[in-house]
């Protein structure tokens, strides 16, 4: 079992993943586990500290979430955040009740006592609150470390036990010195060293791959995107002669995607590539299917079938490698009290029975860490910083049924969007950009004639790891040119809209 410097127990906060990210940014390896993980599993990870995340529940409610009380007897530093703070207070017999004044947004705190969390930080700072309950009295054995206007117990702790509790969220960017607070907890309370980086990760994963695979062969599924390209490069660095790299044209690719992928692997990466055209089988199975989850399941199942057929042509193939990321795992499974958001075709979409063992060397890292790993492995910036493209491809960018006419419309619109972003310098400034073909038509006028054609939505977002995102504030003239070109150059589209939703509450992809 992989060891972790700090374990984050997930009680359902939308920010839980950010806690792990902020710690990893400091070179400390943090891992997220469900709140009800067993004490045995916690001990097996040999953590140096534990963080209790926030969450939507109330500790006094009948359906409250509680972790194993034994964690408080492990002689490990513990940091409680929001719900985690209230849980710690509740455990030590303090009263937690509904707050008369709910707090959502920025607040000012004042540090009242020097302590490990606020070492070398200003006495007054701005933090981000998001809670509807409050701690009414100080738990026995604890002391106040900081206060806010609405909370005399905003931060409390027991420095002998190295237990600390925060009412606010240090993991979000709106908390002025949040990263420093988490870093101080890891460094001064937990005695963690900043040794986690992609160089050490690459070395560890290569050794793990060699040990697990032995003399068998690995079928590596690639899409041409960053994730699968990095997986292929990592496998090649570990067991190059045992890797069979396969690219499947599922009929759901962007314009000229197949040709670009083949060129990149053969000429840029120097990796032999087997290219399979399976577009007919994918599109036939997607016919008349409109439910997004069903689309993902069908695509996931069909991918595996195609790969298994290819594996039969090669001796000693026992493994299938995929570019599954930590974000995929989080969004596809119930981690702690968190809810399933959507199935990813390479996680929840997989059949329960496979004839190939799955190997996912990136499943413990986030997107920005994948990019850093790619550079560490020698991939070019052009490959590493390519915009993400989902495994299900354009199928989840067409609302409703997927068919060839719709795919062709979407491809043409997408080409124009990317051309305009690249020519204006906005492509490299954004995380992801694509078009969505909506399953609605609208009335328009072109020349002197009435039209009743399709509407396309432009989605361009800024992000660092894909867990959260904001819509990109593109200049009006850029948006205007994109809209004008799509309507004038793509027959069958007469309306273009811009998605100004952030994640959360929306996801980046529409399906």
UniProtKB/Swiss-Prot annotation:
GO terms for molecular function: ATP binding; GMP synthase activity. Keywords: ATP-binding, Glutamine amidotransferase, GMP biosynthesis, Ligase, Nucleotide-binding, Purine biosynthesis. Residues 5-195 form the Glutamine amidotransferase type-1 domain. Its EC number is 6.3.5.2. It holds the Pfam family NAD_synthase. Signal peptide: none annotated. The active site is at 82 (nucleophile), 169, 171. Residues 196-386 form the GMPS ATP-PPase domain. ATP binds at residues 223-229. The keyword Ligase applies. It catalyses: XMP + L-glutamine + ATP + H2O = GMP + L-glutamate + AMP + diphosphate + 2 H(+). Pathway: Purine metabolism; GMP biosynthesis; GMP from XMP (L-Gln route): step 1/1. One of its GO terms (cellular component) is cytosol. It comes from the Bacteria. Gene3D superfamilies: 3.30.300.10, 3.40.50.880, HUPs (3.40.50.620). Homodimer. Catalyzes the synthesis of GMP from XMP. This is GMP synthase [glutamine-hydrolyzing]. The gene is guaA.
